[in-house]
Curated annotation (Swiss-Prot):
Protein role: Attaches a formyl group to the free amino group of methionyl-tRNA(fMet). The formyl group appears to play a dual role in the initiator identity of N-formylmethionyl-tRNA by promoting its recognition by IF2 and preventing the misappropriation of this tRNA by the elongation apparatus.
Family named by the database record: Belongs to the Fmt family.
Binding-site residues for (6S)-5,6,7,8-tetrahydrofolate, renumbered to this chain: S109, L110, L111, P112
Sequence intervals crossing the membrane: none
Name assigned to this protein: Methionyl-tRNA formyltransferase
EC number per UniProt: 2.1.2.9
GO cellular component: a single term: cytosol
Enzyme class: transferase
Organism per entry: Geotalea daltonii (strain DSM 22248 / JCM 15807 / FRC-32)
Keyword annotations: Protein biosynthesis, Transferase
Molecular function terms from GO: methionyl-tRNA formyltransferase activity
Length: 312
């Protein structure tokens, strides 16, 4: 079976590697253009491109996959199936209609929950205790196609998006392999999604990481977990950004956003109905440190206020 693989970030690499290991006929990989990334804004290739080139697979990097010339070049490759994992562009109907076996997407949630761009983040932010991967037939909607196979995993109450990302990328590769086996055996069963059960995982922005201390401790912890490592959570102390990487829930009382303890255990901040202890942080212009180490050299008084940059 002639397969085109479409994907871009690290999350997609285990699935491509699985296709390679299975000796599937991957005739091309389509990924996003090389783009500036990281602190130095160095132009770097997508991880999927690097993996494809290591195995001698032809790579295409269209700025827009929907333009007619690109669609035509894909048609000329005569794929039987297109596999899509975190590609980053919407596929037009003209492209979806090309392969006789359709386009199968590996989506990092238990559909119909968390359709959209950032399911890994939102399932943690919302406090879900279980998530997984769904393989689905793609249609013109946003993650609305028929479901094929699901694999579930529990979410540890202390894990962040990075560890969940790494685990689901492997689960996704296994799910795709099982889906292909069912397809080859003629046993693939399609299941319609129930739109009434859906919710959307919208793309996150840096400003979404500003901590609202008027929330309850569990919600604050879930935000920190769900936004780590990107886009990150933060607050402000005396007008300086304070990045927050890890917290634990406590039972202190005080005005939300007020520092109610600072010591070797961390920086305790009042929320509504309790408190959190910041265990790892980074003040603007300083190194990322365990909070106890940071507080050994930088005094923050009990009663100090955390909040918006312009907060008094």
């Amino acid at each position: 079976m002639r397969i085109i693989f479409m994907g871009t970030p690290e999350f997609a690499c285990p699935t491509l590697q699985k296709l390679i290991d299975r000796k599937e006929e991957v005739v091309a990989v389509i990924t996003q253009p090389d783009r500036p990334r990281g602190r130095g804004q160095q132009t770097l290739p997508p991880p999927v491109k690097v993996l494809a080139e290591q195995h001698g697979i032809p790579v295409m990097q269209p700025v827009k996959v929907r333009v007619p010339e690109v669609v035509e070049s894909i048609r000329e490759l005569a794929p039987d199936l297109i596999v899509v994992v975190a590609f980053g562009q919407i596929l037009p109907k003209s492209l979806l209609d090309i392969p006789p076996y359709g386009c199968i997407n590996v989506h990092a949630s238990l559909l119909p929950r968390w359709r959209g761009a950032a399911p890994l983040n939102w399932c943690i932010i919302d406090g879900d205790t279980e998530t997984g991967v769904t393989t689905m037939m793609m249609d013109v909607g946003l993650d609305t196609g028929d479901m094929l196979l699901k694999k579930t995993t529990s979410i540890d109450p202390d894990e962040n998006t990075q560890s969940l990302h790494d685990r689901l990328s492997i689960i996704g590769a296994d799910a795709l392999a099982e889906t292909l086996d069912l397809l080859n055996a003629g046993k693939l069963v399609r299941e319609k999604q129930d739109d009434a059960l859906t919710c959307y995982a919208s793309m996150l922005k840096k400003e979404d990481g500003l901590i609202d201390w008027s929330r309850d401790p569990r919600s604050v912890k879930n935000l920190v977990r769900g936004m780590t490592p990107w886009p990150g959570t933060y607050t402000f102390l005396d007008g300086k950004m304070l990045k927050v990487y890890r917290v634990r829930i406590a039972e202190g009382e005080g005005e939300p956003g007020t520092v109610i303890g600072a010591g070797r255990q961390g920086l305790e901040v009042a929320c509504t109905g309790g408190s959190v202890i910041i265990e790892e942080l980074q003040l603007e212009g300083k190194k990322r440190l365990p909070a106890g180490d940071f507080l050994a050299g930088y005094k923050i008084a009990t009663g100090a206020k955390l909040g918006h940059k312009d907060a008094a």
